Amino acid sequence: HLLSRRQRQMCIRDSSCTITLKDGSSFDCLVPVPGIHMVSNAVAGAAVGYTLGLTADEIKAGIESLPSIPGRNHIIETDHMIILDDCYNANPISMKASIDVLNMAIGRKVAVLGNMGELGDTAEALHAEVGTYAAEQNVDLVCGIGDLTRSLVEEASKGANTEALWFADNESFIQAIPDIIKDGDNVLVKASHGMNFPQIVHALEEL
């Protein structure tokens, strides 16, 4: 093993960890993108840097200067809410990872989830699995957009602490935003690229 890491703190804005290199040196590091999966990515990057001869200080500086990219775990803070913009693409594993990030937030948690593409005959079951996971994580409100999210919404609605709503398309959800999104909400926005969810992010920013 080139190195190890110890998770220290996570929140919806960032994560911190301690990275220990093979030579025994260690350093505290702030990963400016939220999520334990992003910490794992940072550790992988640190391993590559160490192998290439970078110092601990250089590795730390590189990780901590990681830019936030729209559509990829990008945090947007407005006057009314925090938006977790992870809408570039989606699959069942990344959906669950994004729900985990949302679950770090303090306050009401809303997951706006759209179709996941290219799942073939397993699409209905895998969307349902994500809905079950959202309910298990006690997401307060799950909004499914698109035909494939019907099973997701159905399963999410079975959660004792989860409300679930289904919308046929982006436009119908956008029209409902003033009625369902509240001041102080934390809102995850995620779907496959073809769903054009940047449109959803923009509408939330305009609220």
Regions found by a protein language model. Give the residues of each.
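Single conserved hydrophobic/aromatic residue that forms the stacking wall/gate
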Residues: 1-12
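ATP-dependent carboxylate-amine ligase
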Residues: 23-24, 28, 34-207
